[in-house]
From Swiss-Prot:
InterPro entries: Mpm1. Its main location: mitochondrion. The keyword Membrane applies. The gene is MPM1. It is a peripheral membrane protein. Residues 230-252 are annotated as: Disordered. GO terms for cellular component: mitochondrial membrane. Keywords: Membrane, Mitochondrion. This is Mitochondrial peculiar membrane protein 1. It comes from Saccharomyces cerevisiae (strain YJM789). It is found in: Mitochondrion membrane.
């Protein structure tokens, strides 16, 4: 169904979230997209929660601020009640009224009205993700904030200057390129890769003339974990491999 049910591991929800992040909608949504087109607003309509000043929403035209808080106006809510609709919120926190088919036809041409059955049957979220509880919307926003921070951290790690020695220069951009890792899953398919990072450094022990090369590979997953593999090699010795899984907060 087109509703978010609080499970970020649901296959359809994960696919929607991955595409949402990859398309950068979460980070770059235009400011005015936060507000709906309130074509039915007039000077007699008021916000459901009172404002500490007089305000005529009609003065703002088609892109009114009335819905910035995700709360309908009195007129909108009354219309929704009249049509036996139910409240829902979009991924941008915009309030909508989902109206059952018995109220159709004709469904009034108002921007905040949507057909309930069409949204409920939209399993692939082609019409977007909807929330029938504002707390679920806040939970989803929190989850998406973590994913966005994780991706930003991954990209920052990837583009940091890594070259320190001639050996380091062997690392090329292809090794660091993140591409569309959100489309790829872990080996067991339980979680998706959202980014990669790799670094190579050369160290030299003061008590040993032999330099050691340390290669660190990191894979970032959508559940907030990081798979870290460190391979240390030195001339005349077998490679030493260390592997661990940590949270993105523990990743230095």
């Amino acid at each position: 169904m087109g509703f978010y049910e609080g499970d970020d591991n649901d296959a359809n929800t994960k696919a929607f979230n991955d595409k949402y992040i990859k398309d950068q909608k979460f980070a770059t949504a235009p400011f005015w997209n936060l507000f709906p087109k309130l074509r039915d607003i007039d000077e007699y309509d008021n916000p459901l929660l009172p404002l500490p000043f007089n305000f005529n929403f009609r003065d703002l035209g088609d892109s009114a601020l009335a819905m910035a808080s995700g709360i309908p106006t009195v007129k909108q809510f009354d219309k929704c009640e009249e049509l036996k609709g139910q409240s829902a919120w979009t991924t941008q926190g915009i309030w909508k009224c989902l109206v059952p088919s018995k109220a159709i036809p004709p469904l009034p041409q108002l921007d905040f009205l949507l057909p309930l059955e069409e949204i409920k049957s939209d399993k692939s979220h082609s019409h977007g993700l909807f929330f029938n509880d504002f707390n679920l919307f806040l939970k989803w926003r929190s989850h998406m904030n973590r994913l966005q921070k994780q991706r930003i951290k991954t990209r920052t790690t990837a583009v940091e200057p890594l070259a320190r020695t001639p050996e380091d220069l062997m690392l090329n951009w292809d090794d660091l390129h993140l591409g569309n890792d959100a489309e790829y899953a872990s080996a067991d398919g339980s979680k998706k890769i959202v980014g990669r990072a790799q670094s190579i450094s050369t160290t030299k022990d003061s008590n040993d003339a032999k330099p050691s090369t340390v290669k660190t590979e990191k894979i970032y997953f959508d559940d907030g974990t990081v798979d870290i593999t460190t391979t240390t090699t030195s001339k005349g010795s077998s490679p030493q491999v260390k592997h661990k899984v940590v949270s993105v907060d523990e990743d230095n």
